[in-house]
Amino acid sequence: MIFNVLTIFPDMFPGPLGYSTVGNALRKGLWSLNVVDIRSFASDKHSTVDDKPYGGGPGMLMKADVLGRCIDSVLEAHPDTRLIYTSPKGKQFTQDMSRQIVHFGNITLLCGRFEGIDERVVDVYNFQEVSIGDYVISGGELAAMVVIDSCVRMVTGVIGNKDSLNRESFDCGLEYPQYTRPASWKGVSVPDVLLRGNHKETELWRCKMSRIITERRRPDLLKDCGGEEEGSSNE
């Protein structure tokens, strides 16, 4: 799995992606990271990558010609790469989308800055626009890291226990509550069913709690599980 990241702040990477499970997988060669400095494709001595928007308005936009040269260089080396632009205007990034992206094998993530990028870049190169949520952050780098982390976890060999992926939130509803030692802490005890060692009862309890939590917090997710959106259980 190859991720090409186009950014004006290449030193931000790998950042958090260099730690824990995803970082170990990077060092083992289970996925690779190719960070491309957009400024290196600027044509002036100041390495200018932005300009004022036509029609006026606040802020600056990243220039189409500079971005175009940067993207072309990546496409020359990786002609089959999937182009993704992290943008608050994009479609909401989900676990299902993460699964789909992994199948491409080679992904190029364009990280916007300032007020965004010249729209012609999205149109000419047919970028898939992806948003990590209904909020605005300073740039696309953190969003790109979220996308990469989510995708890398599903690469074969990255997560040792495959059941961990199958039981996570959003696979089909939200994840059930989990507990570890001590059995009692600050007057709160672990549910008895988890202490009895009956695997069937444990699974039934987990399914029930997953359903209850999903109904209360994210009923929209139940549509993908063949459930109803309305109603919640207080049992």
Curated annotation (Swiss-Prot):
Catalytic activity: guanosine(37) in tRNA + S-adenosyl-L-methionine = N(1)-methylguanosine(37) in tRNA + S-adenosyl-L-homocysteine + H(+)
Residue sites binding S-adenosyl-L-methionine per the record: 112, 132-137
Compartments, record wording: Cytoplasm
Keywords: Cytoplasm, Methyltransferase, S-adenosyl-L-methionine, Transferase, tRNA processing
Chief subcellular location: cytoplasm
GO BP of this protein: tRNA N1-guanine methylation
Summary of the function given for this chain in its UniProt record: Specifically methylates guanosine-37 in various tRNAs.
Family: Belongs to the RNA methyltransferase TrmD family.
HAMAP family: TrmD
PANTHER family, A to Z: TRNA (GUANINE-N(1)-)-METHYLTRANSFERASE
Name this polypeptide is given: tRNA (guanine-N(1)-)-methyltransferase
Biological source species: Anaplasma marginale (strain St. Maries)
